[in-house]
């Protein structure tokens, strides 16, 4: 006789456990599941739990050599999505033992690495994760965080101002440095390499770093303020990336930059550790995020990528602008902005927050509002994002008809006016345009 009956097994027999009581140490996931026609939601949810943890399509002999009850993922709750046909929110609990300590790479490889191509599912989206404090404590997190950054820069009580240098490609290193100097001298706190500025034939990284450092120190001497330029250290290998970060540190600049999705979480975590050890701030760009998060029923919501970045490490991350979007999108965006900044966040489905999240004092990340914004958006941005943010105007600075420095002056004056008006009790949503007009006189 044989020990078990071979053949295809229903996942729900093992992995659908609606009576399961989640543990404080479990990683919890909320998936938006669209099953194939004829596949019950319980089977689809159990399949997700199985294929992202211990399961395969049949019973295997080696199942008897371990404790599946200890290590398996469990689909513990399913709810239909209101207003959507054949879509369900499936909740899965994963035992903490399944994950390597301090590795976002391993966490994602387990939870989303294989299951998204599963035949029983028409579409699958990871909406949110609850990361338990026991796992968070295995990560360094951001190199410095919001308060330490403010102390390093000696800038308090207002959002920070930035500018992406344009045109993003084609400038020589010296002309690039000139634009950096003009913007910083005009009143900005930071300027920025674009995400695809690495080390191309028209401007090699070392030349850019040297001219930008010169611009930073000249602007600091003239304004009496601490300035920075996000020097993009992203490279083709981790070794080259660290080499660029080392050179930035040797120049004495305050901040470097990384494209964390195209560069990868392993590289990003290595760079974040280097930055903390060597006193560098780390700006994070989310290039490639829309490939993952744009579809509403498949992929991964950006709030998951934002949580992962806080664990992997970064002091700033691009987070959208909200301005001009629908109210619902505003609430969703502010939901993950607060996930980046706050120490504890309550579950709030209206803001897209599926679980309570406690960060056990891990430093926060400054959200960066960037993309298509200009001086007339300043009142709304100041009101929506508050002081702990970076407002980044590329064309909104360099597009000023009088030049780069006047563009920077306009942004700084508008920001100072909006902050002062807010502190004096004005309603920025109602009076914002009048405040900007009066400031322009």
Curated annotation (Swiss-Prot):
It catalyses: 2 (2R)-3-phosphoglycerate + 2 H(+) = D-ribulose 1,5-bisphosphate + CO2 + H2O; D-ribulose 1,5-bisphosphate + O2 = 2-phosphoglycolate + (2R)-3-phosphoglycerate + 2 H(+). Gene3D superfamilies: Ribulose bisphosphate carboxylase, large subunit, C-terminal domain (3.20.20.110), RuBisCO large subunit, N-terminal domain (3.30.70.150). The disulfide bond which can form in the large chain dimeric partners within the hexadecamer appears to be associated with oxidative stress and protein turnover. The active site is at residues 166, 285. Its EC number is 4.1.1.39. One of its GO terms (molecular function) is monooxygenase activity. It is found in: Plastid, Chloroplast. Mg(2+) binds at residues 192, 194-195. It comes from the Eukaryota. The keyword Lyase applies. Transmembrane segments: none annotated. The record marks 325 as: Transition state stabilizer. GO terms for biological process: photorespiration; reductive pentose-phosphate cycle. The modification N6-carboxylysine is found at residue 192. Its main location: plastid. Its cofactor is Mg(2+). Keywords: Calvin cycle, Carbon dioxide fixation, Chloroplast, Disulfide bond, Lyase, Magnesium, Metal-binding, Methylation, Monooxygenase, Oxidoreductase, Photorespiration, Photosynthesis, Plastid. Substrate binds at residues 114, 164, 168, 286, 318, 370. GO terms for cellular component: chloroplast. Belongs to the RuBisCO large chain family. Type I subfamily. Heterohexadecamer of 8 large chains and 8 small chains; disulfide-linked. The disulfide link is formed within the large subunit homodimers. The basic functional RuBisCO is composed of a large chain homodimer in a 'head-to-tail' conformation. In form I RuBisCO this homodimer is arranged in a barrel-like tetramer with the small subunits forming a tetrameric 'cap' on each end of the 'barrel'. RuBisCO catalyzes two reactions: the carboxylation of D-ribulose 1,5-bisphosphate, the primary event in carbon dioxide fixation, as well as the oxidative fragmentation of the pentose substrate in the photorespiration process. Both reactions occur simultaneously and in competition at the same active site. This is Ribulose bisphosphate carboxylase large chain. The lineage of its organism: Eukaryota, Viridiplantae, Streptophyta, Embryophyta, Tracheophyta.
